[in-house]
From Swiss-Prot:
Disulphide-bridged cysteine pairs: none
Protein name: N5-carboxyaminoimidazole ribonucleotide synthase
PANTHER family in the record: PHOSPHORIBOSYLAMINOIMIDAZOLE CARBOXYLASE, PURINE BIOSYNTHESIS PROTEIN 6/7, PUR6/7
PROSITE patterns: ATP_GRASP
Gene3D superfamilies given in the database record: 3.40.50.20, ATP-grasp fold, A domain, ATP-grasp fold, B domain
Catalytic reaction annotation: 5-amino-1-(5-phospho-beta-D-ribosyl)imidazole + hydrogencarbonate + ATP = 5-carboxyamino-1-(5-phospho-D-ribosyl)imidazole + ADP + phosphate + 2 H(+)
UniProt-listed Pfam families: ATP-grasp, PurK_C, RS_preATP-grasp-like
Organism field: Brucella melitensis biotype 1 (strain ATCC 23456 / CCUG 17765 / NCTC 10094 / 16M)
Alphabetical list of InterPro entries matching this protein: ATP-grasp, ATP-grasp_carboxylate-amine, ATP_grasp_subdomain_1, PreATP-grasp_dom_sf, PurK, PurK_C, PurT/PurK_preATP-grasp, Rudment_hybrid_motif
Similarity annotation: Belongs to the PurK/PurT family.
GO biological processes: 'de novo' IMP biosynthetic process
UniProt cross-references to SUPFAM superfamilies, sorted A to Z: Glutathione synthetase ATP-binding domain-like, PreATP-grasp domain, Rudiment single hybrid motif
């Protein structure tokens, strides 16, 4: 550890109190760190395992001042933290990953632009401000695409598929997203979806986990399988892109980068998340060091850990009524269960995950 590394007993502030914040707090505790959560919902999943919670809005000035004063470093568990709040914290505290990464990722336009400018290929896309630009974008992209709101869309929300040049359908689609600023992403025939979980420390060192192959259902991640059924060359291209992105952002922490894989093995970046990622939960059961520990290591100024995988695995999200599967899962021989402490199992709500491991093959 260098002189700037956090010593045991230091405090890590975490903005956001969901399951990602919970698992970050648990990882921090293993290193002897205390955690303080800023989250408006009292008794949130992260607060259940943290030392303290500030119950306030993410942009509450008094709460931000309290968090900054109490923390040796501040991180966040989701990408829709108000950038103004992160910038305010950064005036008096160390905020990692840097707020600039938040700002870029919060807007699909700036995200796609940054990826392309960093030499990372994406599906073709066009900016959409109104019906006229949407119709023009459809024409430019061959009459097919996915209309996506620029901000606050996640788990498939704020998206409409378009499959023709019909202007009425285009106008209806724009109305369906409440005429919000958007992009139109060209439709691509992909063979599979994969993601890479990568980390960069304060000195610029990079460590990357094996790629996961992801399956989504209703816009929400259903399973992540490792190893992904891709070539060595495709996997290496994804790792290279992730490393390129980490350096371009001057990033510190863990980042998730998602790709479409075309039939010929070509990779098209879909999006990145400047945080620990749902498709990296498998690392908790199949690696010596999880993505959560890796993130804590990075932001605390500790050396990055070994990302080697000791097992093959399939991570399955438990959503809503899947809570009823828990008794059976507990009887499975090689299933690692993690529940998030949520008080209500609503439809579409992630309440936990299970990772089924088996001996490593490749």
């Amino acid at each position: 550890m260098d002189k700037t590394s956090l010593k045991p007993g230091s405090t890590i502030g975490i903005i956001g109190g969901g399951q990602l914040g919970r698992m970050l707090a648990m990882a921090a505790a293993r290193f002897g760190y205390e955690t303080i959560i800023l989250e408006p919902q009292a008794g949130c999943p992260a607060a259940q395992v943290a030392n303290r919670q500030i119950v306030a809005a993410y942009d509450d000035p008094k709460a931000l001042a309290e968090l900054a004063a109490a923390s040796d470093v501040i991180t966040y568990e989701f990408e829709n933290v108000p950038v103004s709040a992160a910038d305010k914290l950064a005036e008096t505290a160390l905020v990692l990953p840097p707020p600039a990464a938040l700002e870029i990722s919060q807007d699909r336009f700036t995200e796609k632009q940054f990826l392309n400018e960093s030499g990372i290929e994406t599906a073709p896309w066009r900016l959409v401000d109104d019906e006229e630009t949407l119709i023009a974008a459809l024409g430019a992209l061959g009459g097919r695409g996915i209309l996506k709101i620029r901000r606050l869309g996640y788990d498939g929300k704020g998206q409409v598929r378009l499959a023709s040049l019909d202007e009425t359908q285009a106008c209806n689609a724009f109305a369906a997203i409440n005429k919000a600023p958007a992009i139109l992403e060209g439709f691509v025939e992909f063979e599979r979806e994969v993601s890479v979980i990568a980390a960069r420390d304060r000195s610029g060192n990079v460590a990357i986990f094996d790629l996961a192959e992801n399956v989504h259902k209703d816009g929400i991640l259903a399973t992540s399988t490792v190893p992904a059924a891709i070539s060595v060359q495709t996997a290496e291209a994804a790792r290279t892109a992730a490393e390129k992105l980490l350096h371009a952002l001057d990033y510190v922490g863990v980042l998730g980068l998602e790709f479409f894989v075309l039939k010929d093995g070509t990779l098209l970046a879909n999006e990145f998340a400047p945080r620990v990622h749902n498709s990296g939960h498998w690392t908790e059961a199949a690696c010596a060091i999880s993505q959560f520990e890796q993130h804590i290591r990075a932001v605390a100024g500790l050396p990055l850990g070994n990302t080697d995988r000791h097992s093959d695995c399939v991570m399955e999200n438990l959503i809503g009524d899947d809570i009823e599967k828990v008794p059976a899962i507990l009887c499975e021989k090689n299933a690692v269960l993690h529940l998030y402490g949520k008080k209500e199992a609503r439809a579409g709500r992630k309440i936990g995950h299970v990772t089924r491991i088996k001996p490593r093959t490749i």
